[in-house]
């Protein structure tokens, strides 16, 4: 299918499956905020323009007061959650995260969708405890769910080339498997267009499909295309994915991952119009208004959206807009 020129036919098949899984003509969005608590990282991924090494003049670790302010601003805008991630800081043990999460939960009623698989592995290593114990302790401290970041392409041949210091494929899967077994829901992602082959993408999708069959713990799948500006990988990947490539990939992902209920169409990397079209290529969710986003924006993504922008693009595509929470529950009166 990746080699097919029948874009409309592939899109129609994906839309047919989307209608089967979501028969009420609803498309969803969320109001939340990305909070990047630190940009210090030891991984130096070639596709990332966000990280700074420890000791760099632009390196930071946000104090609680800054994070609290960001959370309050999110709540004031009608937000329901924060997506909190950072670099792999070499000096922050699990106690630092436990204290932060507990203090947030004591002060705010908000969903904590926090820490990627590489971050959890980093915390486990620093703290000298198992992955399962790390997740259990973080869950007990206030972690509600885990984002799917750090997957990139789940094939070690690709990972060695673009992120050789980051966790390998099996390690990423092991974090999500452990989380699901502990009752913690997670999302799955794919960053494509970084020089991988079609076979690499299919391998990635098959691994996610197999894990979902095993655990049922993924709430959603979010694919996005590599943004090359200001990244070292951008010197080798000369062209970013086109809108046609995005829509075809989105549709194929929807068809392949028929056991993951929700698939997000991205406006952050592709813009609002392509995102809107994606609702007819298998997507049922348009993501967040993104009150704050620092990672892909530093790699060249420059799109922005308000809540009304997202509601309008959903209505204009023929769907009923519904605000959801991080776990894809739509109990809001809108």
Question: Can you annotate each of these PLM segments?
Answer:
Residues 27-35, 82, 112-116, 146-148, ...:
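Hydrophobic faces of well-ordered beta-strands that scaffold small-molecule active sites
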Residues 52-203, 207-210:
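Conserved Radical SAM active-site core
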């Amino acid at each position: 299918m990746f080699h097919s020129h029948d874009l409309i036919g592939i899109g129609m098949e994906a839309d047919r499956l989307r209608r089967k899984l979501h028969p009420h003509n609803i498309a969803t969005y969320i109001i939340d905020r990305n909070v990047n608590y630190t940009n210090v990282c030891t991984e130096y991924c070639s596709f990332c323009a966000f990280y700074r090494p420890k000791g760099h003049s632009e390196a930071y670790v946000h104090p609680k007061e800054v994070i609290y302010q960001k959370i309050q601003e999110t709540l004031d805008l009608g937000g329901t959650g924060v997506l909190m991630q950072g670099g792999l800081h070499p000096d922050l043990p699990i106690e630092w995260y436990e204290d932060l999460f507990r203090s947030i939960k004591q002060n705010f009623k908000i969903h904590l969708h926090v820490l990627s698989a590489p971050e959890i592995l980093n915390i486990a290593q620093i703290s000298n405890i198992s992955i399962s114990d790390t997740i259990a302790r973080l869950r007990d401290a206030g972690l509600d769910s885990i984002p799917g970041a750090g997957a990139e392409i789940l094939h070690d041949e690709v990972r060695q080339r673009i992120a050789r210091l980051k966790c390998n494929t099996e390690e990423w899967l092991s974090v999500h498997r452990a989380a699901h077994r502990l009752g913690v829901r997670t999302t799955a992602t794919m960053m494509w267009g970084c020089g991988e082959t079609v076979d690499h993408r299919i391998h990635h999708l098959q691994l996610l499909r197999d894990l979902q069959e095993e655990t049922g713990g993924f709430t959603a799948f979010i694919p996005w295309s590599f943004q090359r500006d200001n990244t070292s990988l951008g010197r080798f990947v000369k062209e970013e994915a086109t809108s046609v490539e995005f829509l075809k990939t989105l549709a194929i992902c929807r068809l392949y991952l028929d056991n993951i209920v929700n698939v997000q169409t991205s406006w952050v990397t592709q813009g609002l119009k392509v995102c809107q079209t994606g609702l007819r290529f298998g997507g049922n969710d348009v993501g967040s208004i993104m009150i704050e986003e620092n990672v892909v924006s530093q790699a060249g993504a420059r799109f922005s959206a308000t809540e009304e922008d997202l509601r309008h693009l959903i209505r204009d595509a023929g769907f009923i807009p519904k605000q959801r929470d991080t776990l894809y529950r739509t109990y809001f009166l809108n």
